[in-house]
A protein has these predicted regions:
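Consensus positions within tandem repeat domains that build extended binding/scaffold surfaces
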Residues: 144-146, 166-171, 189-194, 212-215, ...
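Structural signature of tandem-repeat unit edges
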Residues: 105-108, 117-141, 151-164, 174-187, ...
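Sequence-pattern detector for short linear motifs
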Residues: 5, 9-10, 34-35, 67, ...
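N-terminal capping/linker segments that flank leucine-rich repeat
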Residues: 2-19, 23-149, 155-160, 252, ...
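Short intrinsically disordered, low-complexity segments
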Residues: 14, 18-21, 31-34, 38-41, ...
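Alpha-helix C-terminal capping segments
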Residues: 96, 286-287, 330-334
Length: 536
């Protein structure tokens, strides 16, 4: 056998078999022949999966699935069902005197239900004469699905006095380019202009106070839109997948932006928020949009899950001082390069910056009390982090595979470091754990392949499995006197680890705790040691 560590373990196993429970503080070694004999007898297959397969294949997959599922995992939002439904009910109506329009009378008012075949430029009159009633009726409404799927309409002009447009009224009018609405229009119902793929020009009137979901989704040629202040809430998926939409202006009075409202607006570069009225941005509101920068007014207090996720062009963000938390996956998969978290933020939920591969700099406030798991998951460009004194816990997978992270400054009050918190941080060279820490979770510093020195203070009483797994350049380890158990696979595959002194507090050495430490020539074991597991 070629490895010194096998000599060491063979000696430990042989002597432990002869000396029950209590071992003196001695350095042990064994002759080559003894090592070969014992190792061949006791070296079984690993009884637990290695973190490289366990975390990368299982945890990483689960995390990615969780993030993509809540952070705009679909590349596009499917076209609403009613846009594909051949059974959409087209309204009945009777023709006008000139035969150009179809209508029905409801409560002494005319509703438009369609137009004559071949109509390209539609001008709707302000009144319609009904021959049966011998009366003029004001035109106030376009009925639901009135022009559904009409491929001939190109322009529509509505009269003064028009107050509403029904659901799906112009859905799928793929040649419609321009719509003129009067200031009297108050409501546009769901799907009204959905999939009008050539619509380039539409002005929403100041009178508008309601717009339903999907009203302008998949309007692929629409380039700009101004939302009037009377429209206090922007509906869900209202402009989703408007691929050419570049500019959005929200006038004072707009209070909330609905979920998926601008989802998939890949050309969207600028959103002008109102100064004081907007308070809420709902889930996935700008997911997969083309935004390059965001400046949220201080009136914004709530930004919901994944609101700006998958914004690959997003470089800079100014957060509102009115916010107290960052919700789950807010900027996951975005192109962020730097961000300063304001003092008002006390909580950062899971996955907020996960997979932000360009994120280099983050400033965390001293007011921060909670940072959940996977917040900086796989932020491969993050180089340094200063953790505030207000933070007591480093959560699981917090800096998982932040491969450029080379400088970590722990806060004065941190007491635990979670599982896989710094897993795969391959640019770290030294780990100095504060003397306030009592627990290191499983795989906390595993795969930190360039770490050469680790100091575990006396305050630490709990070292999890695999904690320093595969730290291939680790040579210098100091273990504090608070540790009683060197758990399974603790230093597994630390193949440059040469000399370790186990403190007097340790009573047990778990299986494979030093397995694969091929450079180890001696190990100091304390009188307190009660058991050594197989292949330790």
């Amino acid at each position: 056998m070629r490895s010194n560590w096998r000599k060491t373990i063979a000696g430990i196993v042989a002597i432990a078999a002869l000396i029950p429970c209590c071992l003196g503080t001695t350095a042990y070694a064994a002759p080559q022949s003894a090592a070969d004999t014992v190792i061949s007898a006791v070296m079984p297959e690993l009884e637990e999966p290695m973190p490289s397969s366990q975390v990368d294949a299982q945890i990483a997959a689960d995390v990615k699935a969780a993030i993509s599922g809540t952070a705009g995992g679909l590349e596009t939002i499917p076209t609403p069902n009613y846009a594909e439904d051949p059974d959409v009910e087209i309204p009945d109506g009777k023709p006008t005197q000139d035969g150009k329009l179809y209508y029905k009378i409801v409560s002494k008012k005319a509703q438009i239900t369609g137009c004559a075949p071949g109509t390209t430029d539609l001008v709707i009159p302000d009144t319609i004469y009904d021959e049966e009633d011998e009366e003029d009726y004001p035109v106030t409404f376009i009925a639901a699905a009135a022009f559904y799927g009409n491929k001939e309409l190109q322009t529509v002009t509505m009269p003064d006095g028009m107050v509403g447009i029904g659901a799906n009224a112009f859905l799928g009018c793929t040649n419609l380019t321009s719509v003129s609405m009067p200031d009297s229009v108050a409501s546009i119902n769901g799907g009204a202009f959905c999939s009008c793929s050539n619509l380039t020009d539409i002005k929403l009137p100041a009178s508008l106070y309601f717009v339903g979901d999907d009203a302008f989704s998949y309007c692929a040629s629409l380039e700009s839109i101004t939302i009037p202040g009377n429209l206090t809430s922007i509906g869900s998926t209202m402009f989703a997948n408007c691929a050419k939409l570049k500019t959005v202006v929200l006038e004072e009075g707009v209070q909330s932006i609905g979920s998926n409202a601008f989802y998939g607006c890949s050309s969207l570069d600028t959103v002008q928020f109102p100064e004081s009225s907007c308070t809420r941005i709902n889930a996935n509101a700008f997911t997969y949009s083309g935004l390059s920068s965001i400046e949220l007014p201080d009136s914004v207090t709530n930004v919901a899950t994944a609101a700006f996720s998958h914004c690959q062009n997003l470089k800079t963000v100014k957060l509102s001082s009115g916010m107290t938390s960052l919700r789950k996956d807010t900027f996951a998969y975005s192109g962020l390069e730097s961000i300063e978290i304001p003092d008002s933020i006390t909580t950062i939920k899971s996955g907020v910056f996960a997979y932000c591969s360009n994120l280099k700099s983050v400033t965390l406030p001293q007011t921060l009390k909670q940072v959940d798991e996977i917040v900086f998951y796989s932020c491969g460009s993050l180089e340094s982090i200063v953790l505030p004194d207000s933070l007591t816990k480093i959560s699981d997978n917090l800096f998982y595979r932040c491969t450029s992270l080379n400088d970590v400054k722990f806060g004065a009050n941190v007491n635990s470091i979670g599982a896989s918190a710094f897993y795969g941080c391959t640019s770290l060279t030294e780990v100095n754990i504060p003397d306030t820490v009592t627990k290191l979770g499983q795989s906390a510093f595993a795969e930190c392949t360039n770490v050469t020195k680790i100091t575990v203070p006396d305050s630490v009483t709990d070292l999890g499995k695999w904690t320093f797994y595969n730290n291939a350049n680790l040579t210098d380890v100091t273990i504090g006197n608070g540790v009683t158990n060197l758990d399974n696979y603790l230093f597994y595959r630390c193949n440059k680890l040469d000399n370790v002194t186990v403190p007097e507090s340790v009573k047990k050495v778990g299986q494979y705790a030093f397995g694969g430490c091929t450079s180890m020539s001696n190990i100091q074991l304390p009188d307190s040691l009660e058991s050594i597991d197989k292949c330790a």
